[in-house]
Amino acid sequence: MKKTFVLLLALCMAAVFFAVPVFAEGDGNAQPAAAPVNTQEALEQALAAAAPAGGTVTLAADITLKTPITVPANVTLDGARTYTLTADTDFNGSYVVLATGNLSNVTVNAAGKANYAVQVYGETANVTLTNVVMQNGNYSGLVVNNGASASLKGCTFAGNGFSAVELADGKDHSGAAPKLTVDSLTDEVTVRADVSANAQPVLTVENGNPVLTGKVNGQTVYANNSEAMLAALCNTQGATEIALGGNINLENPLKITQPVAVNGNGHELTVTKDITGVSGYGNAVTVEADGVKLSNLTVNANNNAKYAVHVYGAQNVTLDKVTAVNGNYNGVLVNGATVTMKDMTFRNNGGSKEMGGIELGKGTNVQNTPKVTLEGTVNSDKLDKVLYVDTQQVDAANAAGAIENKTSNLNITVGADGSVTVVDKNAKPDPKPEEKPSTPAPSAPAKANPKTGVKA
């Protein structure tokens, strides 16, 4: 009995000092639970641990960052559709996240402390960003740099300085141009290219919608082909060029206050809402800046605007291959401005009124006498009404000086009363009555040969 007690005591002491882990049945391969990713240190450790084999690191909390983090090439950082990475007040870095791997379901907030929320960098980078919010970058939400490629799906941008996305060469880079694929361009997603002339970026819009392009301060801007983006570019300081990617409907008057060249590329602006009652701007397009050029463009007032184009007080404006149609009054109104018109077309303007093409006047608060210079071919369905000088605003004595017929197809005569007579010098006049060919008399019916019965 004593020996048995001693043996049991020894076994108990061994159990205390040499404890053996106990696993539930079937848990022979169980591992310790991963630490939650809720601090910058934990995030960096999780990304490093995932890098060799790849995989997904999922945030467990909002994280404030003091320095940038890098997502490795074969890793996806996921925000669980809930969490945000935010630059701290003393953040030190040009970007918040360097993405050589993928991002999904996360918000990256530069908080005005970094130039970019996300950077995709290098020719080997081919990154997909899915449902990522990029906001409050001093320059842009996203920069795609040094020949990198990025694909955006369901991404949004807010509060960024110059554009949603920047495509850049990067310092001392002379290789491939950056590539960007987006599922769609919205009015909130503008793309700015800061690249050399030899490395033009590649932009692909997957839904196939047209793209509006422009030049602002020497950089190319890609935007949604919409009324809002066209209006924004026409009134952005530093804008010099705009090219339409497709037709645009206008629900508001389009004002042009910057010296831009707008190339319609054969497309049309159509007014879809009655704007005739808009004070001072009841016209489809109103040009108020010197040096504006409109080309290869149809402006369709659609009987919803007084004029298709109104040039107000601006100098050295050019309309080249512009078609002005369906204005309630004339196609183009020139108020105290100087305009050169080349190869113009006017149709269906003025309705039943004695109007149809170009009207010259002064308008409100304008002292200068208007002047139009005509070049090339002027086409109009009301050629006799293609030029009209408002002698209530322009003295009849000055009417002739308001029209310079430089190289056009028109013969223009301005009367002492300011009335204008127009004839197309290339038109063939109707022949005089005595020159018109007479209608030949009908020939008598042929008689049959009595011998053969055959008609001659």
Which role fits each region the language model picked out?
Residues 42, 46, 181, 204, ...:
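Charge-rich, solvent-exposed alpha-helical interaction surfaces
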Residues 1, 13, 22-33, 199-218, ...:
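Intrinsically disordered, low-complexity repeat and linker tracts
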Residues 1-25, 46, 59, 142, ...:
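Gram-positive cell-envelope targeting signals
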Residues 40-41, 56-75, 80-88, 240-260, ...:
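N-terminal extracellular ligand-recognition/capping segment immediately after the signal peptide
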Residues 60-63, 107, 245-248, 298-300, ...:
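Generic short beta-strand segments
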Residues 30-58, 64, 211-245:
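Acidic Gly/Asp/Thr-rich repetitive segments characteristic of extracellular carbohydrate-active
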Residues 72-76, 93-107, 119-131, 144-159, ...:
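Surface-exposed loop/turn motifs in large extracellular/passenger domains
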